[in-house]
Amino acid sequence: MDASPAQPQQLIASEAEYRSAIDELLGLAQREVCIFDRDLGRLALDAKERSALVEAFIAADSLRRLRIVLHDSAVVEGASPRLRELIRRFPGRIELRQTPDELRHLADSLLLVDGQHGLIRFHVDHARSKRVLADPVELAGRLQRFEDLWEASAPLSLGTVLGL
């Protein structure tokens, strides 16, 4: 294992590197994780190991928050039982919002951790991304963008699915 410190910024070119960066950043989270994405499909928060990272983060302290802004909630509603269970178990700590129609053209993705670390996917259909560690100045504009999207978006209430 390489003991050298991680580069503060790293360009990412593959899906494998992207997934690795997601796991790295979720492991660093101490207060808040903010996500903006089309549908969470590429972030795969419902994958077993990644879901465990999200659960460990959110369960560690009642003040921790996960805020998610989505264009489309279909993946969360239909193919994310682990994430839906976390939302049920930790009400108020995990919040989802959906963008209004006029913002659905936005095609990037953001994963922002504690205002310090981030993963910026330049276009949701391409792996090309940038991972930023311990650089709040670099991420300030992205954080403001997330807050603007959050304010412009409507709260998303996931319906309860009853098994009959």
Regions found by a protein language model. Give the residues of each.
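Charge-rich, low-complexity N-terminal segments
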Residues: S4, E24-L25
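Acidic/glycine-enriched edge-of-secondary-structure segments
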Residues: M1-A16, R31-A44
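Primarily the HKD phosphodiesterase
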Residues: L25-F90
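HKD (HxKxxxxD) catalytic microenvironment of the phospholipase D
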Residues: V33, E95-R142
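Short beta->alpha connector loops
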Residues: A16-Y18, D101-E102
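Signature of lipid phosphatidyltransferase scaffolds
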Residues: I12, F122-L164
